[in-house]
Each structure stands twice: as C-alpha cells, then as structure tokens.
UniProtKB/Swiss-Prot annotation:
Gene: rdh10b
Protein's UniProt name: Retinol dehydrogenase 10-B
Keyword Membrane: yes
UniProt pathway: Cofactor metabolism; retinol metabolism
A single GO cellular-component term on record: endoplasmic reticulum membrane
C-alpha cells in the first residue's frame, strides 16, 4: 500500500472514529457482564474504592479487596457480603440446599501497602494461589499530603508518588503477564482531573496523577501495538470528589454552583458505566473535557487569568490551611 492510499485509509478511520464516538452520545452501548469475574480493587477500605467494591458486588463479581487498613477493608467486605445475600435467588425448590455452596458470597480481603512493591508482589502471589487469575484490576488507592511544597517533608512527597503512581507499575506488573497470555482482562486507572490540569499548592499530588495518566496511556498504546485487543483499559478522571480528601477546597462563591464537588456515588456510577462499556476514558463532569482542551490551545497567561476569575488559582489554600491546623493540633495533643 503506497503512502497516498494509506493516508486515505487513515483519514477514513479517523472520521469513522468520530462517528462512532458521536453515536455513543445518543445510543447507550450495552454493558458487559462481570458475573463470576475476579476483580482486584486497591484502596477498597473507604471512599471510591469501597463504592467500586459494592457496585461490582451488585453485579456478582468475585471481589479481591486490598487496603492498608485491615478493619476498614473488612467493613467493606461485610457490606459486599450483605449485597450478595440480598442478591441470592430464592428458588424455593427442594434441592435449593444443594445449590447454596454455589451462591455463597465471594469476597477476599488482603492487607497490602501498595507503596511497597515487595508487599504488592507478595499479595498478588497470594491472590493467584488462593483465588486464581484475575479479570479486572482497579488501581484506585490514593493519598494526598495537604502541604505546600516547601512545608512538605520529603517522606510525604515520596509516599504520595509511590501510592498514587508507582503502585500502578507494581500491580500491573504483577497481573498483566497472565492477561497477556489469555488476551483477556481490564485495567482501570482511577486518576483525577488534577492529572490533566493543575492548581497551586498540590504539586506532589498533581505530579503523581500526571504520572499515573502517563503510565496508563503509554500502556494502552503498548497493548494496541501488540494487538492485545482483548485487554481493555479505562482511565477515570473525576473532578474533586466529596470524600473528605480535599475538604475545605473553595473557589469563588459565585462560581461554586457551576463546579460543585462530585458526590462519590455519582462519580462511581459514571465510572462503572465507562468500565462496563469498555470506554477508554471518562471525565466527570463532562465539562472537564472542555477544560482539558482549552489548556492545550490557550496561552498560559490566558489560563492564569481564567483561574483567577473562577478562584481556582488559590482554591486549595483553605484546604491546606485546614490540614496544617489539624496537624498542629495533633502534634500539640501528642506533645510533639
């Protein structure tokens, strides 16, 4: 095929991809079933991780929950088991007792510090031994230091990078080989809108999320280059979610109604729809797509001007001040 013909084919494919993307706005794609599939969720003990676990439980997936907090992880597991009990069909037949073992909830919990690759690899080996091969990997675990750059201890910066970014390397390296062998699987990266554009005062968090997105996109291209179309990738980039992680963050009060913090339940439902329809990327709310596009075409000074108008230039400062006050109070109580 000469270059002119190839250019025509490429142009047609690009136009066709726009047509397909537009069609999905009007025709909702059919959601795939994850019943019986093994789903690993990191950071499952609270926040979005817990909600992801409950959503997958409602769809009868086998849950493998990872968290550094054993107690909160077990609480999530018990919530999932309760969902399983409610979903259990009541046949009323005489042989229903024989069917019960097939209907028992399948929830496994593991205590794992995803910032440590040795812990990740060891836990992944336990999962393969005790549960089997996995089908879905939800890289969700995340932390925020809540400190200005010059006030933030190096250890906190390192931990933010390790949990929010490096952990994605370790979990993927642990589970991807079998996915490649079977040409089957789904990897979900729960990032943030702060991995697409930035604001002042959260340099470490933004850098970690930019890194996670870069890792995700590069891996997506690698899988396509290897013709591993059976392995799906979904990137989740929500706006600030009302989980308490960024409590105190404020923009200009006149603009606040247009950019409210997302309800966690809404965020996860939108993400689940994207995952179950094999959507490559989901930004919530949709205006985040426009914000990301504007960043690529507007001069930097224009972006700064818009930030100041919205109040986004210092929106994290109340949150940082609140974190600092909380830290000082804790130190005074403990006599540090």
């Amino acid at each position: 095929m000469n270059i002119a013909t190839e250019l025509f084919v490429v142009t047609f494919k690009i136009i066709w991809s726009f047509v397909l993307a537009g069609a999905k706005w009007f025709i909702r794609p059919r959601e795939k079933s994850v019943e019986g599939q093994v789903c690993v969720i990191t950071g499952a003990g609270s926040g979005l991780g817990r909600l992801f676990a409950l959503e997958f439980a409602r769809r009868r997936a086998t849950l493998v929950l990872w968290d550094i907090n054993r107690q909160s992880n077990e609480e999530t597991a018990e919530m999932a088991r309760e969902i399983y009990r409610q979903l259990k069909p009541s046949t009323g037949s005489s042989d229903s007792v024989q069917e019960l073992p097939l209907l028992q909830p399948k929830v496994y919990t593991y205590m794992c510090d995803v910032s440590k690759r040795e812990s990740v690899y060891l836990t992944a080996e336990k999962v393969r031994s005790e549960v089997g091969d996995i089908d879905l990997l939800i890289n969700n675990a995340g932390v925020v230091s809540g400190r200005h750059l010059l006030d933030c201890p190096d250890e906190l910066i390192e931990r933010t990078m390790m949990v929010n970014c490096h952990a994605h390397f370790w979990t993927t390296k642990a589970f991807l080989p079998k996915m490649l062998e079977l040409n089957h699987g789904h990897i979900v990266t729960v990032a943030s809108s702060l991995g697409l554009f930035t604001t002042a005062g959260v340099e470490d968090y933004c850098a970690s999320k930019f890194g996670a997105i870069g890792f995700h996109e590069s891996l997506s291209h690698e899988l396509k280059a290897a013709d591993k179309d059976g392995i799906k990738m979904t990137l989740v980039c929500p706006f600030l979610v009302d989980t308490g992680m960024f409590e105190g963050c404020k923009i200009r009060k006149e603009m606040a109604p247009f950019f409210p913090p997302l309800k966690p339940e809404y965020c996860v439902k939108q993400a689940m729809r994207a995952i179950l329809t094999d959507q490559p990327m989901i930004c919530t709310p949709r205006v985040m797509y426009m914000v990301t596009f504007m960043k690529t075409v507007l001069p930097f000074d224009a972006i700064v001007c818009m930030y100041k108008f919205i109040g986004a230039d210092k929106c994290m400062y109340p949150f940082l001040a609140q974190r600092k006050e909380s830290t000082n109070n804790n130190e005074s109580k403990t006599g540090i």
